[in-house]
Amino acid sequence: MDNIVYVGNKGVMNYVLAVITQFNSENAQEVIVKARGKAISRAVDVEEMVTKRFMPEVKIKEINLGTDHIQGEDGKSINVSTIEIILFK
């Protein structure tokens, strides 16, 4: 499934437009919004703007929370929170 939008450091509207594009031009029934760390709040903002303002017919199917274990520069293991929001129409 290629209908995944990874949320990072760009502005919220960039990701909102990416989700809307996936639903409209790709004719997708589901779009997954993924983020980790500090970008989690931005991913929630994207979901809220899509479902409340731009595409009210889109609903939340599932929200998954988790933790990624990544290796720090000093060799220590770091836990980073992750979120996956599955939207459908």
UniProtKB/Swiss-Prot annotation:
Role, per record: Binds double-stranded DNA tightly but without sequence specificity. Involved in DNA compaction.
Keyword field: Chromosome, Cytoplasm, DNA condensation, DNA-binding
Primary localization: cytoplasm
Protein family: Belongs to the histone-like Alba family.
Localization of this protein: Cytoplasm; Chromosome
DNA-binding listed as a keyword: yes
Superkingdom in the source lineage: Archaea
InterPro entries cross-referenced by the UniProt entry: Alba-like_dom_sf, DNA/RNA-bd_Alba, DNA/RNA-bd_Alba-like
GO MF term list: double-stranded DNA binding; RNA binding
Pfam families, sorted: Alba (PF01918)
Xref: SUPFAM superfamilies: AlbA-like (SSF82704)
Gene3D superfamilies xrefs: Alba-like domain
Coiled coil: none
One GO BP: chromosome condensation
Name the record gives this protein: DNA/RNA-binding protein Alba
Cellular component GO terms, alphabetical: chromosome; cytoplasm
Source organism of the structure: Methanococcus maripaludis (strain DSM 14266 / JCM 13030 / NBRC 101832 / S2 / LL)
